Swiss-Prot record:
Keywords: 4Fe-4S, Iron, Iron-sulfur, Lyase, Metal-binding, S-adenosyl-L-methionine, Thiamine biosynthesis, Zinc
Domain of life: Bacteria
Swiss-Prot/TrEMBL cofactor(s): [4Fe-4S] cluster
Pfam families on file: ThiC-associated, ThiC_Rad_SAM
Annotated protein name in UniProt: Phosphomethylpyrimidine synthase
Annotated cofactor note: Binds 1 [4Fe-4S] cluster per subunit. The cluster is coordinated with 3 cysteines and an exchangeable S-adenosyl-L-methionine.
Originating species: Salmonella agona (strain SL483)
């Protein structure tokens, strides 16, 4: 852990340098490949890990090798993972989905922004130095049209986004020929239906049923289509965003790029400080993954942080502002009802959700029902016009294991189920947010309650943390719960960093949180039996048994750390071909001994076989040629 503390000026300068020198970069011994689709000029990016051959015999002077297949893996890094792509943060990413959106002929380009706040920001010359220069002219559904992926799915339309996703979810496993790599244990999926092969039609059917969502705002054409659903790979979200006391636009863009490099499937911008609007624009124009927000945070900033002064009008304007910028999903705390707030009074830690506490305070101060609940249909109308998915927030989630699975938590969950049905009336895609802090033996109930109460809409949880005693290590305490609930059926896991409960995460914290949660998600995919999930594990195990150290590093989720740990004790190049590591040394390496046992057993088998043949030869009288009837 680094102990170097940079000043705010140094942090910003470092982030600016990162942005100015940003290039497409592949992981060690990996290359970017594109798998093409059958329609719409679809090219799905993946990372292919190149492997070295296996020594299978021969002599020192004439060794014999067997080639090992390259291993394709899911890649969230977008253009940032392709060395052939020129990166310019000032211009933003290529608009991958724009031709698909325009070809559907159901959107119109707006003459002006719908949000009064946006119009005000755009005319403020004092913001010119901060503003992203290549602003998009926003689009909206034509009158009488809905432009959501759920709407298309219900019409029986397989969109380019759906085909892109089908190819992506299969992870290029059709390229793998080795039976050793293709071997996979049967999973236990708790009633999920995982197909042998994910087809575009399967994607369409899951979206149409509401069991999966494709967050894909028509004003975020830079994003690469992905899916969140129980019957697909478990996804991971990373949170970034400035606060009133720290971080800048440069640092948040740096964290965005860093997050996609380390496997974030979506990113939430939770900015609460200055220049929220401008920061979000830079993030969206440079993001290859869906971006989510909690609009109530910005609405609160517009009323100077006074929850009691929030109004539906200010919130609605914020929704329009963010939808026209391209936000792909909104967290809306519409389930925090006035009658549920007293249920939290007996809790040890009360209401720990920022959005939940804001709405609870508003409800109590006005003694009125939550205006997000009261205006929920209007929220859905806005979302349907831009294809913004709804992430129904768990404002009453437990903030300690003592408060887990209580009346307040599940009362809100049941309300979220009612709101889900309303959103579906408008063809709006929905996922449900979940806890929180839950001990291991109480986690599965959260999944079963969500499936029953929310009609199998995708579940999206923060952890859950399985114990409260480890500040500084809550990426571990929550990673345990995340792996469990992912196995039980949770579709997306919101990462927790080492700074949880302690401070705003920096770049290294983001990486630590993501690696922890990619492990949890992958462990869940293995346990569920997601097709092809075990290929990378098998490749790693084979490389490990054959002492192919470079391949072990390169197959790792974090090749750099794996290599660094190995080189701490065996830094010489000879250590990377040695048939042992520093833990056991050459005499006690179990895998080296296993290889020797295997070779010895094979030799013994041959020797025994030859002895049997010799005995049989003598029993036949020692004749070289036998009579036909004796054969």
């Amino acid at each position: 852990m680094s102990t170097t503390t940079l000043t705010r000026r140094e942090q910003r300068a470092k982030a600016q340098h990162f942005i100015d020198t940003l290039e497409g970069t592949a992981f060690p011994n990996s290359k970017r490949i594109y798998v093409t689709g059958s329609q719409h000029d679809i090219r799905v990016p993946m990372r292919e890990i190149q492997l070295s051959p296996t020594l299978i015999g021969g002599s020192k002077d004439n060794p014999q090798f067997e080639e090992n297949e390259a291993v394709p893996v899911y890649d969230t890094s977008g253009p940032y993972g392709d060395p052939e792509v020129a990166i310019n943060v000032q211009q933003g990413l290529a608009k991958l989905r724009q031709p698909w959106i325009e070809a559907r002929a159901d959107v119109e380009t707006l003459a002006d922004r719908s949000s009064a706040y946006t119009r005000e920001r755009l005319t403020d010359e004092g913001l010119d130095a901060l503003r992203f220069t290549g602003l998009l002219t926003p689009k909206r559904a034509k009158a009488g049209h809905r432009v959501t992926q759920l709407h298309y799915a219900r019409q029986g339309i397989v969109t380019p986004e759906m085909e892109f996703i089908a190819i992506r979810e299969n992870m290029g496993r059709e390229r793998i020929r080795s039976e050793v790599l293709r071997h996979q244990h049967p999973g236990m999926s708790f009633g999920a239906r995982l197909p042998e092969n994910i087809t575009p039609e399967f994607v369409r059917d899951e979206v149409a049923a509401g069991r999966a969502i494709i967050p894909a705002n028509i004003n975020h054409p830079e994003s690469e289509p992905m899916i969140i659903g129980r019957n697909f790979l478990v996804k991971v979200n990373a949170n970034i965003g400035n606060s009133a006391v720290t971080s800048s636009i440069e640092e948040e863009v740096e964290k965005l790029v860093w997050s996609t490099r380390w496997g974030a499937d979506t990113v939430m911008d939770l900015s609460t400080g200055r220049y929220i609007h401008e920061t979000r624009e830079w993030i969206l124009r440079n993001s290859p993954v869906p971006i989510g927000t909690v609009p109530i945070y910005q609405a609160l900033e517009k009323v100077n942080g006074i929850a009691e002064d929030l109004t539906w009008e200010a919130f609605r304007d914020t929704l329009l502002e963010q939808a026209e910028q391209g936000v792909d999903y909104f967290t809306i705390h519409a389930g925090v009802l006035l009658r549920y707030v007293p249920m939290t009074a007996k809790r040890l830690t009360g209401i720990v959700s920022r959005g939940g506490s804001i709405m609870a305070k508003w409800c109590l101060s006005h003694h009125k029902e939550n205006f997000l609940f009261e205006h929920f249909r209007e929220i859905c109308e806005i979302c349907a016009a831009y294809d913004v998915s709804l992430s129904l927030g768990d404002g009453l989630r437990p903030g300690s294991i003592q408060d887990a699975n209580d009346e307040a938590q599940f009362s809100e969950l049941h309300t979220l189920g009612e709101l889900t049905k309303i959103a579906w009336e408008y063809d709006v895609q929905v996922m449900i947010e979940g806890p929180g802090h839950v001990p291991m033996h109480m986690i599965q109930r959260n999944m079963t309650e969500e499936l029953e109460s929310c009609h199998e809409a995708p579940f999206y949880t923060l952890g859950p943390l399985t114990t409260d005693i480890a500040p500084g290590y809550d990426h571990f305490t929550s990673g345990i719960g995340a792996a469990m609930i992912g196995w039980f059926g949770c579709a997306m896991l919101c990462y927790v960093t080492p700074k949880e409960h302690l401070g705003l995460p920096n770049k290294e914290d983001v990486k630590q949180g993501l690696i922890t949660y990619k492990i949890a998600a992958h462990a869940a995919d293995l346990a569920k039996g997601h097709p092809g999930a075990q290929i990378r594990d098998n490749a790693m195990s084979k490389a490990r048994f054959e002492f192919r150290w470079e391949d072990q590093f390169n197959l790792a989720l974090d090749p750099f750390t794996a290599r660094a740990y190995h080189d701490e004790t065996l830094p010489q190049e000879s250590g990377k071909v040695a048939h042992f590591c520093s833990m056991c040394g050459p005499k006690f390496c179990s895998m080296k001994i296993s290889q020797e046992v295997r070779d010895y057993a094979a030799a013994q088998t041959i020797e025994v076989g030859m002895a049997n043949m010799s005995e049989n030869f003598r029993a036949k009288g020692g004749e070289i040629y036998l009579k036909r009837e004796e054969v």
